[in-house]
A protein has these predicted regions:
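Short, intrinsically disordered, charge-balanced linker/junction segments flanking boundaries
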Residues: 1, 62, 307-311
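Active-site pocket-lining segments that scaffold enzyme catalytic pockets across diverse folds
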Residues: 1-14
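Short coil/turn connectors at secondary-structure junctions
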Residues: 2-4, 50-53, 78-85, 107-111, ...
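Beta-strand segments within the central parallel beta-sheet cores of soluble alpha/beta enzyme folds
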Residues: 5, 82-89, 150, 194, ...
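Short, flexible loop/turn elements at secondary-structure junctions
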Residues: 10-11, 60-64, 89, 197, ...
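Thiamine diphosphate
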Residues: 16-137, 139, 146, 154-160, 244, 261, ...
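Short acidic-aromatic active-site loops that bind/stabilize oxyanions
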Residues: 54-62, 148, 232-236
Length: 311
């Protein structure tokens, strides 16, 4: 935790970093007096500024956010000491700093980008706060693995993976295109989490090794298909409650007719499928991607309905 630094462009409170800042403090080259403490004012925010603080507060400057994430994410190659930078931002405002994000990924900087709120949980603000196209941004960036979990146990699993993934390095001369590592996880990269502030009822379940692997690889069967399955609803992110409700209604009318495929990363499902095709082209015919394994459980005539909180 001493190597984690957080940074936010004017949205520290609204992206729920207040508790972290209370514990770890703001970074400032010189110590600053907390006037709330001096004046004995009541506040939930105890933000002490000092050279040992681990949160950097920016103004409304998303481009600066990505420049800072890039610089901090390259600390291991410049100074020989790795930092684990975490940046929080409103999801649609990623577009304000795309050029800096492109170059950060191009340089193989390592960081965790947390974008929240997004989609329907941000849409009521209207205007420029429309988070629609960002899933495509996440899929299109080499060196950036994007995830969009719906449940907290999925998020916990992904974050545990992410902090290791940020630190992985490719061994010189190592061939990354092997069946055991279709997604190139041994080489590492940065991670983008597209999250929501929507209240979603959580499951009480145990994440075993198999489910953990499926969550990280991009998807799993939330409601497994039965032999009578005729429809699959594949969803990602905050639309989970409506999908589960629809599945219950359809299966009530026609038992076993509907299955639900929970996608945690469309990016990694697609990337794994593309890499599997390349490997098969090279002669490894038995290689199969996660999405192929999942869809292999249903007949070819089953209809698939996809639902996403975006475009």
């Amino acid at each position: 935790a001493q190597r984690i630094i957080t940074v936010s462009p004017d949205v520290t409170v609204s992206t729920n970093l207040s508790g972290w800042v209370n514990q770890r403090g703001l970074f400032h080259v010189n110590g600053q007096t907390d006037m709330f403490t001096v004046e004995e004012l009541q506040t939930m925010h105890r933000w002490r500024a000092s050279p040992t603080g681990q949160h950097i507060e920016l103004g409304i400057a998303e481009n600066n956010l990505f420049l800072l994430l890039a610089a901090a994410g390259l600390s291991h190659s410049i100074f020989g000491e790795r930092l684990l930078p975490v940046g929080t931002i409103y999801d649609p405002f990623i577009e304000r700093g795309l050029d800096a994000l492109n170059y950060a990924c191009y340089q193989d900087a390592r960081f965790l980008l947390v974008a929240t709120p997004s989609g329907i949980s941000l849409a009521p603000e209207g205007g420029a706060h429309q988070s629609i196209g960002t899933p495509l941004i996440g899929m299109s960036k080499p060196g950036l693995a994007s995830f969009e979990p719906a449940f907290t146990d999925e998020l916990s699993t992904i974050m545990s993976f992410a902090f290791s993934y940020l630190q992985h390095e490719k061994t010189e001369g190592e061939d990354t295109a092997i069946e055991a590592d279709l997604l190139g996880d041994r080489c590492g990269g940065s991670v983008y989490l597209r999250l929501t502030t929507r209240r979603i009822e959580q499951f009480e379940r145990e994440i075993d090794d198999t489910l953990m692997s499926e969550i990280i690889d991009g998807g799993y069967w939330l409601v497994p298909p039965q032999s009578s399955c005729s429809v699959v609803i594949a969803y990602i992110g905050a639309v989970a409650p409506q999908v589960i409700e629809s599945c219950d209604e359809l299966n009530h009318d026609s038992p076993g007719s509907t299955a639900v495929l929970a996608i945690t990363s469309a990016d990694r499902l697609h990337r794994g499928w593309m890499e599997a095709q390349r490997i098969r082209y090279r002669g490894l015919e038995k290689c199969s991607a996660q999405v192929e394994k999942l869809l292999g459980a249903i007949d070819s005539n089953v209809r698939i309905v996809t639902v996403t909180d975006g475009h």
